[in-house]
């Protein structure tokens, strides 16, 4: 209100479409969530003005995307297994499990023994260092789809060293705030997959730029969640329709975390783990 909107107003003559908003905000350091809030609203309004679904405006080629669930730290492996079973009943096929020291190898071994066929990911949220290489080499034996953010968010060089030791793909999340971050991580081999979060990178244009660069360099991406309301989730659905979003996404039913979402109809995941993207103009949902 005090800086970004006045900045945009002063530069309106340079804005021909929503992709130009990110260029106006490029001079602003960080403040990614605020920049994203403004830019994504403009994308929605513009898509409605040209009578297109947002996903088509972004260049998406999928009308449905696969969702997935992320499960936090549980007190025991049994509690984790029971939680996974409950989500499977609701249609979720891809399971991501949070890990940290003391809540890692025993838990993943138990989950893999109970569910030998599921798509299983682990997310460390920067809980480890390169000194934990023995643990990661053991996790390498459990057919994981990826290990997300094993080391600190600024440890790009150490991530590259770790990736060389593992067959399991490393996915970076907190380390990737911008196209420059993605470019550096890709160029030194610090990852094989990127988790793109629209709000964290400053909006849809930046998310698409990271997607495009990753695609050019053979690196797949998927869409992460910041526990958005339905409005944010709708933008996530739209960006996840792009071709190089190869993996199941942290996009889930509205009722997963909210008793009553602010959109209608609410987002629902099917029994096959897929979510259909609305064909209506803009984000495709009404505000309730």
Q: Where is each model-derived feature located?
A:
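Generic detector of well-ordered alpha-helical packing
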Residues: 40, 45, 97, 124, ...
């Amino acid at each position: 209100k005090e800086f970004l909107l006045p900045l945009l107003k002063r530069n309106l003559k340079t804005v021909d479409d929503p992709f130009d908003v990110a260029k106006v905000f490029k001079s602003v350091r960080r403040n990614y969530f605020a920049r994203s809030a403004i830019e994504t609203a403009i994308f929605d309004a513009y898509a409605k003005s040209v009578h297109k679904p947002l996903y088509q405006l972004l260049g998406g080629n999928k009308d449905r995307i696969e969702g997935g669930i992320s499960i936090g730290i549980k007190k025991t492996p049994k509690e984790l297994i029971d939680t996974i079973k409950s989500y499977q009943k609701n249609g979720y096929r891809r399971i991501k499990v949070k890990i940290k020291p003391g809540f890692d190898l025993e838990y993943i071994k138990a989950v893999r023994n109970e569910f030998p066929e599921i798509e299983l990911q682990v997310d460390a949220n920067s809980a480890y260092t390169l000194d934990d290489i023995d643990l990661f080499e053991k996790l390498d034996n459990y057919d994981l789809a990826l290990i997300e953010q094993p080391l600190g968010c600024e440890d790009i060089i150490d991530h590259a060293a770790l990736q060389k030791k593992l067959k399991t793909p490393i996915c970076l999340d907190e380390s990737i705030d911008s196209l420059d971050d993605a470019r550096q991580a890709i160029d030194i081999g610090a990852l094989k997959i990127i988790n793109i979060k629209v709000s964290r990178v400053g909006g849809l244009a930046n998310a698409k730029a990271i997607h495009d660069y990753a695609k050019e360099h053979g690196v797949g991406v998927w869409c992460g969640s910041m526990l958005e309301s339905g409005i944010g989730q709708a933008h996530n659905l739209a960006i996840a329709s792009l071709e190089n979003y190869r993996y199941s996404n942290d996009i889930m039913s509205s009722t997963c975390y909210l008793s009553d979402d602010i959109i209608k109809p609410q987002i629902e995941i099917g029994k096959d783990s897929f979510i259909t993207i609305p064909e209506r103009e803009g984000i495709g949902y009404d505000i309730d």
